[in-house]
Amino acid sequence: MQTVVPDRLQGTDGIRRETKSAKDSECRGSTPLQIFLEKGWITEEFMELYVYCYVKNQKKSAAPKKRTIVIGWDPRDTSGNFTEAVVRGVRKAGGEAMVLGVVPTPLVPLFMLHNGADGGIMVTASHNPKDQNGIKLFLPFHGMKPLPSDDIDLTRNLLKQNFDAIKKLPLKGGRTDCQQKALALFQHFSLLPENSWIDSPDTLKALILVVDPAFGALTGIAAQIFKEAGVGKVLEVNAGKNGPVNLRSGVADLEGCPRITADMILKP
């Protein structure tokens, strides 16, 4: 039976699927696109192909020069196979990769606009479980998301590609680690008076605040910002590396932490 190819591979906000390694026996003999469409999986090779086409489209729509692309991700890909495939796809397309590493999604367009970059990529499946991953794209105009017509154009470009040829391409663009600069910008932006409802740091001195980042990208970041904002006591739960990201969507309750005890509150 012939595979039906939609006009747009994207859903409401980019692409998301259950992840599967391209080296898995169930993927052998199939192209990244076939695996995506027929089996409903996203492989690291599909991610490389997808962002390669995105960067090529960005280069096509502007004056010829090196495209600078900001790349961030959430912590669900502990192997780094998918995130590194994204960096590789950007560089093979001739893009200069500004790598932020694990950061919250809004920081990608924020850092992109702050630095005058030409595009942004966030590797995440948002609130979906840890066994899934995906890609959100940002455009240089005000950090906007692609319109449906942009998605269609990207899909058409992707359908023309031969991934075997892309695999053999050299890395044309460079790579710069920008995580510390990006996190400093995020904290500064979050604490700006015009972005806050806090009249004075003294306002929150008596507050005890529980922060649950659900083992996601805001682990360690949100809690620190609240401390800097003047919250008297900040308790962070469900934080750390390689945890169950977004267990039961990460918002229903404090998974794995049934109660906040007095000892937790009184601990220095």
Where are these regions (language model features)?
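Gly/Ser/Thr-enriched, mixed-charge loops and adjacent short helices
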Residues: 1-4, 18, 131-268
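An N-terminal, well-structured beta->alpha segment
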Residues: 1-86, 92-93, 175-209, 217
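Bulky hydrophobic/aromatic "packing anchor" residues in well-ordered structure
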Residues: 13-15, 108, 154
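Helix N-cap and loop-to-helix transition residues
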Residues: 43, 104, 147-148
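N-terminal small/polar loop signature for handling phosphorylated ligands or for N-terminal nucleophile
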Residues: 56, 64-132, 224-268
